[in-house]
């Protein structure tokens, strides 16, 4: 049996699903348990509750995570991982000068994710195009890469204004960007 998990808020990067339905690239998507399928839409309203971080090492060959750190809230915390190390072996940028090319390549599979738990509300569509209303639906928004700092800065600005995260409703939108052949949102 599978363990129930919190649906993830993601940005859709697939042009179509397994049934050939066209999907809106760059839209947010969640798996909605009541609908039994993914719902796509943007912009969305997001109410954050908790923000934390976690290191994970992913193997493309095994299509699985090889290790995960504890979930931590502060950079001063020591993120011990599931294989007995720290940060899943991720070496801080300032310490990478002496790494070999292979060691640097290995670092790409190890990432720090910002985990933001909250609720989403939006008017979306199913893959087949049916309208679907999502209201105050609990999700995990896991961000890394170019999203990591902007999301962190937005959440930090809430606390700097002496507001509680769960009293704030953020409007989230995506923006298409390109770097060479890579397209990201």
Kindly give the residue locations of the regions a language model identified.
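Extended serine/threonine-enriched, polar tracts that run as long, contiguous segments within proteins
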Residues: 112-184
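OB-fold ssDNA-binding interfaces and closely related basic DNA-contact patches used
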Residues: 1-132, 179-183
């Amino acid at each position: 049996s599978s363990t129930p998990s919190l649906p993830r808020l993601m940005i859709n990067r697939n042009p179509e699903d397994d049934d050939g339905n066209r999907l809106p690239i760059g839209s947010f998507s969640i798996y909605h348990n009541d609908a039994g399928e993914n719902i796509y839409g943007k912009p969305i309203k997001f109410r954050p509750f908790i923000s934390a971080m976690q290191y994970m090492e992913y193997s493309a060959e095994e299509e699985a995570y090889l290790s995960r750190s504890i979930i931590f809230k502060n950079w001063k915390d020591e993120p011990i991982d599931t294989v007995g190390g720290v940060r899943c072996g991720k070496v801080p940028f300032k310490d990478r000068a002496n790494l070999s090319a292979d060691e640097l390549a290995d670092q790409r599979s190890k990432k720090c994710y910002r985990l933001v738990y909250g609720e989403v509300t939006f008017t979306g569509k199913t893959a087949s195009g049916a309208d679907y209303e999502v209201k105050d639906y609990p999700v995990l928004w896991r961000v890394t890469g170019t999203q990591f700092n902007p999301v962190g800065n937005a959440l930090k600005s809430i606390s700097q204004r002496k507001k509680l995260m769960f009293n704030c409703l953020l409007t989230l939108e995506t923006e298409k960007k390109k770097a060479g052949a890579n397209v990201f949102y």
